Swiss-Prot record:
The lineage of its organism: Viruses, Monodnaviria, Shotokuvirae, Cressdnaviricota, Repensiviricetes. This is Protein C4. GO terms for cellular component: host cell plasma membrane; membrane. A lipid is attached at G2 (N-myristoyl glycine). Residues 42-65 are annotated as: Disordered. Residues 44-59 have a biased composition (Low complexity). It is found in: Host cell membrane. Disulfide bonds: none annotated. It is a lipid-anchor.
């Protein structure tokens, strides 16, 4: 049996009370390929701030941020630092 992978997703928008909670646990089979894709709005409204937090709990109990989260955060910081005319 493969390692236990548990992931919890939480999404919300700034001025909205709508929340999406999804929690799932599965046991990948040896050699099984897992692909997770996320899609975001290309041009979100200025008053809307999408927030997405993903936490992966490894079988040893440690939490790690996904590489995608780190890349998205870096991209967001670069975008907010660039001033447009």
């Amino acid at each position: 049996m493969g390692n236990l992978i548990s992931m919890c997703l939480y999404n919300s928008k700034g001025n909205s009370t709508a929340k999406i909670n999804d929690s799932s646990t599965w046991y990948p089979q040896p050699g099984q390929h897992i692909s997770i894709r996320t899609y975001r709005e290309l041009n979100p409204a200025p008053t809307s701030t999408p927030t997405s937090t993903r936490t992966e709990t490894l079988s040893n109990g440690e939490n790690s941020r996904l590489t995608l989260d780190l890349l998205e955060e870096a991209s967001r910081q670069l975008t907010t630092n660039v001033q447009r005319p």
